[in-house]
Amino acid sequence: MGLLDFLKSKKNTAETAKNRLQIIIAQERNHRGGPDYLPLMQRELLEVIKKYVNIDADAVRVDLVKDGEHDVLDITVALPEDGDK
């Protein structure tokens, strides 16, 4: 059974990698099709948040998501656990 479990785990790993790549591709497509102001908005949000909390540049993510007839601006900010500046 050890060999079968080993082969099965590779399938799960391959499936996980495939799912991750699909997510990355979908995000890249969203960024290409999104408005030109999104990267600037992301940088400006980062600068404002940095005034209050010490965060990295990759901690702020701005995405435009289509939800039926509406476009939804999805802003994700990963804050540090300590919350100190």
Curated annotation (Swiss-Prot):
GO biological process: division septum site selection; regulation of division septum assembly
Record keywords, A-Z: Cell cycle, Cell division
Record-linked Pfam families: MinE (PF03776)
Keyword Cell cycle included in the entry's annotation: yes
Superkingdom assignment: Bacteria
One GO cellular component term: plasma membrane
Gene3D superfamilies: Cell division topological specificity factor MinE
Keyword Cell inner membrane in annotation: no
Family label: Belongs to the MinE family.
UniProt function note: Prevents the cell division inhibition by proteins MinC and MinD at internal division sites while permitting inhibition at polar sites. This ensures cell division at the proper site by restricting the formation of a division septum at the midpoint of the long axis of the cell.
Protein name: Cell division topological specificity factor
The organism of origin for this protein: Xanthomonas campestris pv. campestris (strain ATCC 33913 / DSM 3586 / NCPPB 528 / LMG 568 / P 25)
Lineage, broadest ranks: Bacteria, Pseudomonadati, Pseudomonadota, Gammaproteobacteria, Lysobacterales
Gene responsible for this protein: minE
